[in-house]
Amino acid sequence: MTTAQHQHYTVEVGDTNFTIHSRYINLRPIGSGAQGIVCAAYDTITQQNVAIKKLSRPFQNVTHAKRAYREFKLMKLVNHKNIIGLLNAFTPQRNLEEFQDVYLVMELMDANLCQVIQMDLDHDRMSYLLYQMLCGIKHLHSAGIIHRDLKPSNIVVKADCTLKILDFGLARTAGTTFMMTPYVVTRYYRAPEVILGMGYTENVDIWSVGCIMGEMIRGGVLFPGTDHIDQWNKIIEQLGTPSPSFMQRLQPTVRNYVENRPRYTGYSFDRLFPDGLFPNDNNQNSRRKASDARNLLSKMLVIDPEQRISVDEALKHEYINVWYDAEEVDAPAPEPYDHSVDEREHTVEQWKELIYEEVMDYEAHNTNNRTR
């Protein structure tokens, strides 16, 4: 590396110091979460606006360190227009002993889906957002990554309605048990099979898309449970108690609870999502699109995953297929994700060394690409 590439400067962002490359200027905070603080900045080399995420105390414990490693590996792996791209990664520390900070540089978007949900979306915008969501999910699935935790706060959009998925969901080892309380993170969008601690397949993510679509139409969360039990109750009150064949697939203790709940017949999708909630242009085309949207919801929001629509089927549904582009839907699959990362056990120091090697490798790769 040249001396210029070693130059860093420090900016105070709230109560956090950002020590970043001198190529990035005009920092301003745009968000913070459990995994880090994000600032918008301007990249003077590429001459584009970017988002810089400082991972929050990545070596505080084994869980944080493992999560940081997984996120970094996945961001390097995937490459799709509907998944946030990694533009750069760096650390201001120059050796393993001092290493403590990881910065990820990503594309800058305008808003997350929470803000978009508050707007009155017409059918074209809504179906286009859903189409892009499904394309991104299909790409993750092609790498063997099943998300399980899609939610509006982790989906970002630009003013031109382009959409990107911002994270990679739950690690395969992140099981959830039915009686877990209280809620630490938002679980409103998690599928019944995740809430109930069952096995799951790729269409677990379709449930989340259905919840997000329903929220776009209603303007409010569909199943705002305070814990897993309340979540389950909210689902069956609206959609009805599932069939005995579904109950048979539950673990005995969970089945015992679920079978002893009052039985609900649920409501029709015409009642759950009446015409008045949809864009109304008072024409035949608008009514047909509302009917198509309801039909898609009725196939996504199915408690039994064996009866739920697949990602491929959803992409071909009448409400979505107007946007269908084979190059976007069937983009080249990334290398399969090595799930042994999720199973691996290391000390914090070992994870730290692995992450340091990844960051150094990434910095070297970027430098070589720039100097060719």
UniProtKB/Swiss-Prot annotation:
GO terms for biological process: antibacterial humoral response; axon extension; axon guidance; cellular response to arsenic-containing substance; cellular response to cadmium ion; cellular response to oxidative stress; cellular response to reactive oxygen species; chorion micropyle formation. Its cofactor is Mg(2+). Disruption phenotype: RNAi-mediated knockdown results in reduced levels of DIP2. One of its GO terms (cellular component) is dendrite. A motif (TXY) lies at residues 181-183. PROSITE patterns: MAPK (PS01351), PROTEIN_KINASE_DOM (PS50011), PROTEIN_KINASE_ST (PS00108). Activated by threonine and tyrosine phosphorylation by the dual specificity kinase, hep. Inhibited by dual specificity phosphatase, puckered. The modification Phosphotyrosine is found at Y183. InterPro entries: Kinase-like_dom_sf, MAP_kinase, MAP_kinase_CS, MAPK_JNK, Prot_kinase_dom, Ser/Thr_kinase_AS. It is found in: Nucleus; Cytoplasm. GO terms for molecular function: ATP binding; JUN kinase activity; protein kinase activity; protein serine kinase activity; protein serine/threonine kinase activity. This is Stress-activated protein kinase JNK. It comes from Drosophila melanogaster. The gene is bsk.
